């Protein structure tokens, strides 16, 4: 990787900042990794892991990255909260273990002292970055045009990112079992109302367990090509979403 000496890079001008960040970055084939004072070792780790995770995600999704993106690494959560990237996000969105933030072509990652959390953020960041490229294109014009034609629900996109970054654990099994036990008629729509992202994660787990790993990339591909959520399920799985939800 090439190392570039940075300057006072600006990502926006509307949020109060208590520290000035002097950014430098490492350049890789498909992305740049930004860091500031005290974050060189962390950025090096993130850069190495990001390449591994990107390779794995590209294989899983059967898709190769079509454009460059930036990974912005923060030494701690309080520094991330000062960033001007994505001002529409409030402090509640930066919860520990929450969804990695991907804004445009930027992936925001912070270190909370837990390397497992960091790894999940990197994995989720690579998944989200690739999925956004796959569904909506690499530049702003493509994304605006595609978003008009294809508006995917949170349970589909964020549920998939969660499944790709965390998989399915015994805790998830217990959580789903509790839901089934407490609902008289447990169906996906009710679970979506209760916990949309977990509902999506559960559905993706069911799809891959029932129809095989290749169904994931095939379903994503057909959804993109047909610009239709329903068509993707019918073409790949042979069932409508309503029927799948009932199962």
Where are these regions (language model features)?
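Acidic/His/Gly-enriched intrinsically disordered linker/tail segments
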Residues: 90-247
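Juxtacatalytic substrate-recognition/specificity segment
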Residues: 2-147, 153, 170-171, 188-189
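Generic low-polarity alpha-helical segments
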Residues: 1-2, 238
